[in-house]
Amino acid sequence: MSRYRGPRLRIIRRLQNLPGLTNKLVESKKNKVSGSDQSIQKKVSQYGIRLEAKQRLRFNYGLTERQLLNYVRIARGAKGSTGQILLQLLEMRLDNILFRLGFVPTIPSARQLINHRHILVNNRIVDVPSFHCKPKDIITIGAPKTYQSILSKRLESFAKDQIPEHLTLSLSEPKKPKGFVNYLINRESIGLKINELLVVEYYSRKA
């Protein structure tokens, strides 16, 4: 299954707000159901609940079905909680790190910068959005000056308290912002509200 490229609002109306996909907030279809319609709503099956959790995870991080399945398999083979390791793997992707640092408004925007070879990790160009960032990595922007000025203005208005503790944003040089990875993210700092166990259960027979 390929990566979704359709209307984003349609997705978040169905799956609720996904910060990585879009910064627009909309009321979900579930909240718009009138009192008379609630009585005739079909009960969602356990499979449906797990499927929705999986879809929320996939669309928020911009993954294909195959990519997400591969991450689940990696998480299953590691020591510790499969669900938490899965979230950690997704959060430590380079495209998500750029998003959490405030360099870009969404993960798709981050992926575009990376694909255009504008991102450096430890002074080396990285053009793979799925690149796994590690503690002590330093992330900088090598984009044209026009984007540098846009970025500096964006970061001026970006609230630093939105940056999770495992990351640090340095603006000592306003036109050359730097992002630092302090340590692997913990569960409390995950950017998406989700029950990861539902995703693990969904893939229990596939991974």
Curated annotation (Swiss-Prot):
CC per GO annotation: chloroplast; small ribosomal subunit
GO biological process: ribosomal small subunit biogenesis; translation
Entry keywords, A to Z: Chloroplast, Plastid, Ribonucleoprotein, Ribosomal protein, RNA-binding, rRNA-binding
Disulfide bridge map: none
Subcellular location(s) per record: Plastid, Chloroplast
Stretches assigned to the S4 RNA-binding domain: 92-153
Entry GO MF terms: rRNA binding; structural constituent of ribosome
Gene3D superfamilies xrefs: Ribosomal Protein S4 Delta 41, Chain A, domain 1 (1.10.1050.10), RNA-binding S4 domain (3.10.290.10)
PANTHER family associated with the record: 30S 40S RIBOSOMAL PROTEIN (PTHR11831), SMALL RIBOSOMAL SUBUNIT PROTEIN US4M (PTHR11831:SF4)
Record's subunit section: Part of the 30S ribosomal subunit. Contacts protein S5. The interaction surface between S4 and S5 is involved in control of translational fidelity.
Protein name: Small ribosomal subunit protein uS4c
